Swiss-Prot record:
PROSITE patterns: ENOLASE. It is an enzyme of class 4 (lyase). Belongs to the enolase family. (2R)-2-phosphoglycerate binds at Q162, K335, R364, S365, K386. Pathway: Carbohydrate degradation; glycolysis; pyruvate from D-glyceraldehyde 3-phosphate: step 4/5. HAMAP family: Enolase. InterPro entries: Enolase, Enolase-like_C_sf, Enolase-like_N, Enolase_C, Enolase_CS, Enolase_N. This is Enolase. It catalyses: (2R)-2-phosphoglycerate = phosphoenolpyruvate + H2O. It holds the Pfam family Enolase_C. Keywords: Cytoplasm, Glycolysis, Lyase, Magnesium, Metal-binding, Secreted. It comes from Mycolicibacterium gilvum (strain PYR-GCK) (Mycobacterium gilvum (strain PYR-GCK)).
Amino acid sequence: MPIIEQVGAREILDSRGNPTVEVEVGLLDGTVARAAVPSGASTGEHEAVELRDGGSRYLGKGVEKAVEAVLDEIAPAVIGLGADEQRLVDQALLDLDGTPDKSRLGANAILGVSLAVAKAAAQSAELPLFRYLGGPNAHILPVPMMNIINGGAHADTGVDVQEFMIAPIGAPSFKEALRWGAEVYHSLKSVLKKQGLSTGLGDEGGFAPDLPGTKAALDLIGTAIEGAGLKIGSDVALALDVAATEFYTDGTGYAFEKETRTAEQMAQFYEQLIGAYPLVSIEDPLSEDDWDGWVALTSAIGDRVQLVGDDLFVTNPERLEDGIERGAGNALLVKVNQIGTLTETLDAVSLAHHAGYKTMMSHRSGETEDTTIADLAVAVGSGQIKTGAPARSERVAKYNQLLRIEEELGDAARYAGDLAFPRFGVESK
């Protein structure tokens, strides 16, 4: 059995220049593995708590308290446990913290240990992480949902929608999908330059031009797809992350595109969009606690487009189960740091799949070079991954890892392609 012998932690920087936690786990057999924890910009109210130091150091965003929690409390609790007993290790972490939202030790401390333990166990077993976690049937490469125009909390512009994504669903392989995405990305840069628009980048590597609204951004992307010699819809579909909680005020409504709108008016807007553009997915179209609005929206357009719960579900099995029972959404966004342990993440994915919900593996806007989510996407067969534009090394690291996995799988590899969205026939519009 691969016994945990050492647990270390340090403060490192993420892609936004803010501190985050990195954990190293050493086993008795000499194996050493490392995991770094991401951090979000638009965070759901119901996410597990990220422990920050406060004070003047790093403008209050230091994580020395979380590092100390790993070294002083977590390490003694897990040393001596088997790294291949992931559920047992994660339960020990939950019991030690003792709070429902991981606010005592911090989800950033707990997750770092949870992921590093899994990576150490995989290395000790001489298995790639995707194979260790997913078993012999893990072979599906996800569609890269590339965020090529950044708005909302990810950019300092007037665009309310947070992410405009392309989904190369018609590609024959992940390798080709990545090429298509990169070519559309470069085509978009040329389109923006020709129109005198900014080619500055947002947090996730996408361009951040100041545009009049959602339709203008989608039109630009459509032009870029055609400029890359691809067909909009059948080759490359479109997707949005609206992050509607960011512009929702309780009692007032949605302050969207210079108007105050109700949930019903937002639903009408989305219905118009999916009629005009080949949209396969809309994430967080309504606020995280607007359950009635979500249920009505799902009833209205859920048979025509994927409706992804991010802030709504926060990768939490309990909130997801509530949503499934209500009929809210039809897909789960998976962010490991929203819930804080690998076991709970896997439980949420399993619950979603058993209920017929799709899953999309996701990065955070504050990322590191850690590639765990790439392996995790293949391990659970999510069929979709979003990890930013094909730019900035913390984003590209995940795409490059998926290239390696596809190569390692060889003839057994299958690219999810348009089957990632089996209920939604997408044609050029």
